[in-house]
């Protein structure tokens, strides 16, 4: 039987993490593999594109900037963040790059490698709320609508 995170790490041509939070960057920078996403990334030898999105103060924090440098040294690819109005209503660097910018980046990535021309292009897009189980019955969740994921899948 195949192990899920190993099979997924072999399946992808590139792995896109969008949005990439400060917490997720921190986990990657120390090699923490505690869930499907982080175990796939640690098991993969493919390029990984991270798309940071967070409050400007979180982005500029020394810990986040240190994690950014570590991840760049590991070979992770980055697009953004951009300057603009963020979800919290503040303005500054930390806004996620637009889906169009990310699509253009990926198109260029694949064009340079002739990946899409070799076979049918498939993408896995996940969207919606996340759940972190405290125990078998209770969990902490968010109210994500999945709108961002549905926009990507146009």
Predicted regions and their residues:
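A cross-family phosphate/adenosyl-ligand binding-site feature
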Residues: 1-48, 56-146, 150-154
